[in-house]
From Swiss-Prot:
NCBIfam families: PRK15469.1 (NF012013). InterPro entries: D-isomer_DH_CS, D-isomer_DH_NAD-bd, GhrA_Enterobacterales, NAD(P)-bd_dom_sf. Belongs to the D-isomer specific 2-hydroxyacid dehydrogenase family. GhrA subfamily. Catalyzes the NADPH-dependent reduction of glyoxylate and hydroxypyruvate into glycolate and glycerate, respectively. Pfam families: 2-Hacid_dh_C. This is Glyoxylate/hydroxypyruvate reductase A. Gene3D superfamilies: NAD(P)-binding Rossmann-like Domain (3.40.50.720).
Amino acid sequence: MDIIFYHPTFDTQWWIEALHKAIPQTRVRAWKSGDNESADYALVWHPPVEMLAGRDLKAVFALGAGVDSILSKLQAHPEMLKPSVPLFRLEDTGMGEQMQEYAVSQVLHWFRRFDDYRIQQNSSHWQPLPEYHREDFTIGILGAGVLGSKVAQSLQTWRFPLRCWSRTRKSWPGVQSFAGREELSAFLSQCRVLINLLPNTPETVGIINQQLLEKLPDGAYLLNLARGVHVVEDDLLAALDSGKVKGAMLDVFNREPLPPESPLWQHPRVTITPHVAAITRPAEAVDYISRTIAQVEKGERVCGQVDRARGY
């Protein structure tokens, strides 16, 4: 069995050695331009078109939870990957736990009004503030996939009212489910905190815009953990300046790295992290990939395959 590997920033040698240990009798090589030798599987992140074009692969694994970079290249270069080749993404591999940590810590930060106290501290102002109450602090999750379900589970521990919105209705215990565009307004109407975990598809690009933000309760908060293209940044800034949105925690942006001149950097109600909410944990990813390859080799049904038409 032959595996080709490409990632612009990962420690390639570590991955090659780890894959050798996890899948004995396998030959793993780092792909370089001009390498046209046969392979059975490809492990990739932002792969060049020439790496995959024309190959008879058993499967391709995206080394992250998102596959938008591959699918966007496929639109421009359909020859990049044959329709018969399954495309898999890393459904969890430690990302769910990281998303839980990130979301819970920020929700509690807002719920306990630490953002307000930080602003008071900046002006040396000592003033206890009225507390928020859980029943008035409904949390809405945009996107009800694997990571969305993990975040919902962790927030249930803190007894917040929870709701989710997705393409199809979910039946998560303790979570009110909304589905389809016709129910989006009703979903938004009670969301004190809006957590975005949507996939990146043509239908979701720019979804968090002026029209959506206006449907939130006054003084709502936004936590974007999905993709920067979901948010119209100028509309968010306007909502922050007007007070419609009280605070935003942003991990992803339309342009990354976020340009130094972006007004988001200096906005007092915005907190920024550099796309670190959930990173690929190599050891857990290798374990998932090795198990999945074994299932493919046996002809078993495998979870995590991307529906190219839907985009996730």
